[in-house]
Amino acid sequence: MPSKFSCRQLRETGQRFENFLVDRGQDRETDRERLRTIYNQDFKTSFGTPAPGFSSMLYGMKIANLAYVTKTRVRFFGLDRWADVWFPEKRRMKPGLEMSKHHRSLLATIFHDRAEYMHGKHGVNVEVQGPHEARDGQLLIRLDLNRKEVLTLRLRNGGTQPVTLTHLFPFCRTPQFSFCNGDRELPCLLGPGECYELHVHCKTSFVGYFPATVLWELLGPGEPGSEGAGTFYIARFLAAVAHSPLAAQLKPTTPFKRTQVSRNPVVTRRIEEGERPDRAKNYDLEFSLPLGTYYPPPRLRQLLPVLLRGTSIFTAPKEIAEIKAQLQTTLKWRNYEVKLRLLLHLEELQMEHDIRHYDLESVPMTWDPIDRNPRLLTLEVPGVAESRPSVLRGDHLFALLSSETHHEDPVTYKGFVHKVELDRVKLSFSTSLLSRFVDGLTFKVNFTFNRQPLRVQHRALELTGRWPLEPMLFPVASRGVPLLPSDVKLKLYDRSLESNPEQLQAMKHIVMGTTRPAPYIIFGPPGTGKTVTLVEAIKQVVKHLPKAHILACAPSNSGADLLCQRLRVHLPSSIYRLLAPSRDIHLVPEDIKPCCNWDAKKGDFVFPSKKKLQEYRVLITTLITASRLVSAQFPIDHFTHIFIDEAGHAMEPESLVAIAGLMEVKEADNPGGQLVLAGDPRQLGPVLRCPLTQKHGLGYSLLERLLTFNALYKKGPDGYNPQFITKLLRNYRSHPTILDVPNRLYYDGELQACADVVDRERFCRWEGLPRQDFPIIFHGVMGKDEREGNSPSFFNPEEAATVTSYLKQLLAPSSKKGKARLSPRSVGVISPYRKQVEKIRYCITKLDKQLRGLDDIKDLKVGSVEEFQGQERSVILISTVRSSQSFVQLDLDFNLGFLKNPKRFNVAVTRAKALLIVVGNPLLLGHDPDWKVFLEFCKENGGYTGCPFPAKLDLQQGQNLLQGLSKLSPSTSGLKSHDYLPQEREGEEGLSLQVEPEWRNEL
């Protein structure tokens, strides 16, 4: 029966009830049943007029975003102050030996408090005999290959009273160690001066780092219950190491020391600005729609540290509870703007924190040798060529003279970037600084990031409220209005699509336009030709719809350039590529320069008027540059079609930049424009830095949100509804073997291997394969992940050396001197950690004589998974890097962090066309379900080599281990337990710094 109360009345009643609770001092009550009792017995009797039922009132408060409601709890507050997001995905259960949280905590205690376990107690200590080095709390045994070393660990009672050795636990999962403790059975009594020997045998046929831990459990002196009696523990941490010569050269140069983020930015009360690059020149595109600043609320900045602590919604202070509730509420149209705005603010606050890690102390600047107006200073910025940090023309940074850092009121100099050359930036500063400048003057430098992408995303969210976009962003149906007759014949520009029914189907539905106002999605798994399909659809729209005007976008410049290159073949005079003025013209492909806004005669970018741009049938931009068309207020009905390639890479607000203000949904007989999204939700999404935005949904692209949560795009018993979505099935890139695992894991086994047979089988007979005709190698390496200097990023010397060895085999010169059998351009090396990327590059360009001597070795790309998305190579090598420093870390619920990501795994293994080589720690990777499937696939098909493949832990051995460790409780050991692993957390801020993703440089 419908409620007799309106939503407004329900909301007003709820607000009066909330005030009623405040007046009675009961506003902290969250139990739903107790609140029901208060409402029915106390509040309703004092209400004065008929009041709605308790559940109806809660419903009114919930839909008004004024309460967070579960089956048992209720919390009242104003959600619209901050905004809310959707529930995080359920975490995967981890495979392997089932250990309770208690047991994991006890094992973690061993490693985390290892200094405590290494101390002798009651006069009992461990003597070590045999070849070893004591380093960082470990006994390091250096091994030559296939030569045995024996270490004796002698537990000696040096006290005055007897003790009892009750248990001995050797923790090791690798065959490099074997333990022998003689014939003495446990428990055994050790009188004063007596000892118990454990012989540790070490031998390996493989290079690597092999950890083990030995734990002795003893019963202290004295009668049970007397002073001094009780269980105590002593441990020793071992590591057998066999290095290759190359790995020995890659050891840490300096000990790792965590960087302290500067709390004292250089911006002071007095700021003097340099001269900005002249961007108004050649600019005829009128800006008539203002762009706000959209800074994060100051109060949100203050609350962020508390927000990150993980307090419960029902016990947190009210402001914190409000935000937390919003971060756990489903995304709906009614909260769309405020929710996504909150997430953007949180991401920006994390960016502000992360950018401080690039600040420089006491760095010199020099005069730019080229005499120009204005005079520029040159600053060396390591990493800027790789956008770490991103510095573009027009950006700014702050500099403070090193000699004035302790002055009471120093001047901060704001320098504007005029030019970027590799790792050098050229800056304009105020004339007062230039008048006193001499070469070599040193500065403290603070970097900033370009807020333009954030600002235009905020404006796009604002514009969603001005234009009726709900039927497009939260579609429920198609209006079924076609743009062309159903019997129209389409003559294809690319005849290859005729033999691909999925590509043909997608293209026809897009041209017909019957999906409107809902977006059409091209779901394109790796190598299936989604961009080819999208480009053909654009060409057909131009051909068959004479009044159509198209905006074609991608998140990246490379993606937009590719669209331009492929469209230009048949539409040379109909397209125009609009580049941002910060783009380095040297990076723009030569073949698209004639149809972009670069004026070669002027040597500068030009921006034609709105009237001129409207004459082109197709405009091509990045998503962010599309904001210039919004600022120019193109007519809302000018663009009939908006195509977004790589749509899965973009945050939803970023996709909105090219939609809100440029397209609307109209009445039923004219559904308005057609939005087309092409991408793959199973591959990497947007790169985010903030743990809260990662957890609560900003990582969802518009494409992935629709595919995941909207019924129109769900897969049914007969597949997807072709009126709204087409999944491409024919892979034109990879050998079937390389495609096998990702196909089964992520694409329901539907992908068909259609790559050219000659190309894909190029390495099936390569002598380096463990098994012929199986072009995948998993090379097991038990390495050690290291860090050095102030970089939190990990590297693994042994893996880097192994990768280098494979590269030498692959690129070995043929009979022609200096000419490689395989071009370095055809090879890619992927590693998730920035420091490992640096080490591998160092190996191939500096350390290895054979590789560094190749003329084109610099064409061999080494980079992160993100840097390879959308790319392919004949050969891909992957170094996974992470390993372990102790058995405890290795065998527990190890935090794989950056590796434990199905999308990242999928992208990494699907870049290869003909040969895939993975170098990593099989024992560690086997804890992840996807890596485990891949490992077993390699093992079963003969593609595994390297260190022995780990056997499964015997179930009874595991039970005995747990039973013994159950005695390791804090109450008996006197040591505190830990609910976390000793491994440094890889969520929150730590992960983004270890991986060090590129900073955005696409405008």
From Swiss-Prot:
Bilayer-spanning residue ranges: none
Signal peptide coordinates: none
Composition skew (Basic and acidic residues), residue ranges: 976-985
Keywords from the UniProt entry: Acetylation, ATP-binding, Cytoplasm, Helicase, Hydrolase, Nucleotide-binding, Nucleus, Phosphoprotein, RNA-binding, RNA-mediated gene silencing, Ubl conjugation
Post-translational modification: Ubiquitinated by the DCX(DCAF12) complex that specifically recognizes the glutamate-leucine (Glu-Leu) degron at the C-terminus, leading to its degradation.
Family membership noted in the UniProt record: Belongs to the DNA2/NAM7 helicase family. SDE3 subfamily.
Protein name (database record): Putative helicase MOV-10
The species this protein was found in: Bos taurus (Bovine)
High-level lineage: Eukaryota, Metazoa, Chordata, Craniata, Vertebrata
